[in-house]
Amino acid sequence: MQYKLILLVVGLFQASLAYPYADGESVPHPSKDVAPPDTQDSSTQTEVTTQKGWIKQGVETITGMIKGQADIAKDAVGIAGTGTHMGAKITSAAGELGTGIGNAALQGGLQIGAMGVEAGANLAHQGIGLVDKWGQILPGFLGKGVQSVANLAGNIVDKAENIGKGVLEKVGAAGDKGFKWVDSKIKDTANSVDTTVNHITGKIQEGIDKGANTLTGGIDNTLGKLKDIVNNIRPKPVTA
C-alpha cells in the first residue's frame, strides 16, 4: 500500500520523454505536470518559490513513507525465527523502496537533480544486495541463478543511474522502466527463495540479519540525501 502511495507522489514529478529500447518498444510521452496553485498573493508568486514548495511537499511525503517502511523492516528482523519468509519480505521491501524513490527522482527531471537519482540507486542496490545473499547460501544451480539475477539487476540500476544523472531532462522514462524491471526481479527472486527453501538454519538467519542491517543503513543514508535535495535547488531566472 505504501509503495502505491509512493507511486502516486511520483506522479507529481512526471516530466520525461519517450526513449527507445532494443526490442523496439518505446515509452509514451507523459505530459509535464503543472505546479500547484500558490496561496500567496499573485504579486509575490515566483516560479522558484512555487517549484520549491511543490518539490518540498513531495520529498517530505516520500521520506515519511520510506521511514515507515524502514521501521517495519527493523522490527521484523528482531523477531526470533523469522526464517526465509521474513527475509523475502525484507528483500521485496528494499526493491520497492529503491525503485520508488528512483522513479521519483528520475521523473522529476532537472527539478530534482542528480542527487535524487543517486539516492534511489543507492537504495535499490540494498535490495539487490539481499538478493545476492540468497545466492550465497543456496546450493548449486539455484544459488548461481539467483546471483545471476542480482548481477544483472545491479547493472541495470547502474545504467539507469548514470543515464539519469547525465541527461535528466531526456531520459526520465528510460530510468523509470529500468527501475521497474529491477523491482520485479527482486520480488520474483525473493518469492522463489521463500517457497523453495522451507526450513530455517543458522546460516540463513545470519544472512537475513546481516542483510537487514545493510538495508536499514542504506535507508538512513538515502533519507539524508533526500533532505539535501530541496536545500540544493538553485533559483532559476524567471522568464517573461
From Swiss-Prot:
Transmembrane segments: none annotated. It comes from the Eukaryota. Residues 25-50 are annotated as: Disordered. Keywords: Secreted, Signal. It is found in: Secreted. The keyword Transcription does not apply. Residues 1-18 form the signal peptide. Residues 39-50 have a biased composition (Polar residues). One of its GO terms (cellular component) is extracellular region. Its main location: secreted. Expressed by the venom gland (anterior main gland) (at protein level). This is Venom hemolysin-like protein 1. It comes from Platymeris rhadamanthus. The lineage of its organism: Eukaryota, Metazoa, Ecdysozoa, Arthropoda, Hexapoda.
